[in-house]
Amino acid sequence: MITSAHIDDIRTQVRAWRAQGETVAFVPTMGNLHQGHITLVKEAAKKCDHVVVSIFVNPMQFGQNEDLDAYPRTLEADSQALTVAGAELLFTPTPAIIYPKGLAQQTYVEVPGISDVLCGASRPGHFRGVATIVCKLFNIVLPDVAFFGNKDYQQLLVIRTMVEDLSLPIEIIGVDTIREASGLAMSSRNGYLTEEEKAAAPALKKAIDAMAQGIKQGVSIEQVTEEAKASLIAAGFTPDYLEVRHATTLANAEPQDQALVILAAAYLGKARLIDNLRFDR
């Protein structure tokens, strides 16, 4: 696997592949990789001739009092795992390479509406940071296809909307959430959990599953939501949000909506965990 922090190196290699008529898949990450990331890379390798991965802890998507400095950097282990998974090109830029003028002077991309609710309301500016870095990475790598995890459901919709609105010639593929044996969605932030918290963490998925089951049985959204919040609090969580939305627009769910998604974010100790479930009523 070739590794470089330099934009020109990435573009040169991708151009060489394209000159041979070969296809390129891209998996953007912030490193500290787990099996969910590796699954994205393996799916990308099935789809295209070559796989490019980026590792960049993006300061633009971290808010004040968030864990930018504490976010784990595990480049050596990540590189080994990516090589085994089938990645051929790894882009590891510094903030100075990505944002040479600094964040205050950086042109940014903002997807209105869908970026402002749920995680966007809890973390102002987060999705502006996500959209900006992903758009910039797309312009550097110029992939045919890009892969993202369905665990970050709102992020995936933001990126799909950006690609559509800006007419970017890139196919976006979402890959099912990879889970621990306990049912906990794999996340780099799971490393913040104590053993006691890890034992409690599966309550998040259980609460979401119970909400979906109740809605399918005709119980009101308000009732299932209150019951789920109570179960999370009893398990030691501090809920951030727990909501039922239209599956493609993230508008508040209406009685006539069939395609729904439950989205949840909750704190367990120092970790902010998110999860979701898309289902038909």
Curated annotation (Swiss-Prot):
It comes from Shewanella sp. (strain MR-7). The gene is panC. Transmembrane segments: none annotated. The reaction proceeds by a bi uni uni bi ping pong mechanism. Beta-alanine binds at residue 61. The keyword Cytoplasm applies. One of its GO terms (biological process) is pantothenate biosynthetic process. The active site is at 37 (proton donor). Pfam families: Pantoate_ligase. (R)-pantoate binds at residues 61, 155. GO terms for molecular function: ATP binding; pantoate-beta-alanine ligase activity. This is Pantothenate synthetase. It is found in: Cytoplasm. GO terms for cellular component: cytosol. Belongs to the pantothenate synthetase family. The keyword GTP-binding does not apply. It catalyses: (R)-pantoate + beta-alanine + ATP = (R)-pantothenate + AMP + diphosphate + H(+). Catalyzes the condensation of pantoate with beta-alanine in an ATP-dependent reaction via a pantoyl-adenylate intermediate. HAMAP family: PanC. Pathway: Cofactor biosynthesis; (R)-pantothenate biosynthesis; (R)-pantothenate from (R)-pantoate and beta-alanine: step 1/1.
